Amino acid sequence: MTIPALRVTHCPVNTAGVPWQNVQALRRKGVDARLVVFERYKLHPEADESLDRRGGLARQQATQWRALARLLPRTDIFHFYFGLTLVPKSLQFPILRAARKKSVMHFLGSDIRGKPSAELAWAAKAGARIVGSYDAIRWVPEAEVVPPGINLSEYTPVPPSDRERPVVVHAPSSRRRKGTEHVIAACEQLPVSLEIVEGLHHDDARRRYERADIVVDQLNAGWYGLFAIEAMAVGKPVVSFLHDEAVARTEEAFGVRVPIVSATADTLVERLRPLVESAEERRRVGAESRAYIERVHDADRLADRLLDIYSRL
């Protein structure tokens, strides 16, 4: 499915690299897509253009308004992320409507988690709302689900090893939110080597978890993130806390079993133990994980979902 004439500006952040993956996949479909960000993130600096805002609020706003004026004639659809717009929301959506431009608001998790519906009501001004999982949809029930996508050609499976002391990798963006203290405590009770990966550029972090035998994502949020997605893409078994309802809805929507081993802080040791004790089990779950990613998180498949949403704006 291609729409060669469609011009889509994704903005204004590259949170977790999700916007950049979407832009790249849309380009492979023949779409004129670009990513414009306020600033480049240290861990995910990819973007076609950074506004590199300087100075105080007034100067930053002036930079953003100039960017909007420049992008309006070049854009059919503005695809916003993380609850942010180029200019204040109270003006952004009326301007787009007046200019006959379409818009999408794409939430990425922490921007909506736990917020009351009244606080998110403004998102109805966008032509469509997107969330990344059937867990996040409880915060924005009218949203469409488009999971984060990755370019599978960049991920070669590296099956877990058969070493007697498996390497467990945990990469917390926030130790408190990811439950890192419980991961450390659990690994101290098992014959494993724990490696905590923090503050590395995305490519460097990838090289670290490609050496993992087991990956622990998070124990609090109720769904998995990009770290888990990339780990599964290279054939690693992943342990993470998942909400049962979100698992059921995901399996129904995509027709595939979610292979992640669900655990809480209290059950982490017992859930890790079979993976620690059996290299065969690690490889089995790892292979199932790669197959799941091919079905659910292939960026090219997900670009088709985005194009379908765009066509209905």
What is the predicted role of each segment?
Residues 277-310:
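A charged, aromatic-enriched C-terminal amphipathic alpha-helix characteristic of glycosyltransferases
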Residues 237-246:
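Short hydrophobic beta-strand element within catalytic cores of glycosyltransferases
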Residues 7-12, 69-88, 104, 215-218:
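Short N-terminal targeting/anchoring amphipathic segment
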Residues 77-82, 93-113, 128-131:
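Active-site proximal beta-strand in glycosyltransferases
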Residues 8, 157-178, 184-188:
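Conserved donor-binding/catalytic core segment of Leloir-type glycosyltransferases
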Residues 112, 124-157:
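Donor nucleotide-sugar binding/catalytic pocket of nucleotide-sugar-dependent glycosyltransferases
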Residues 76, 210-223, 236:
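Acidic donor-binding loop of glycosyltransferase active sites
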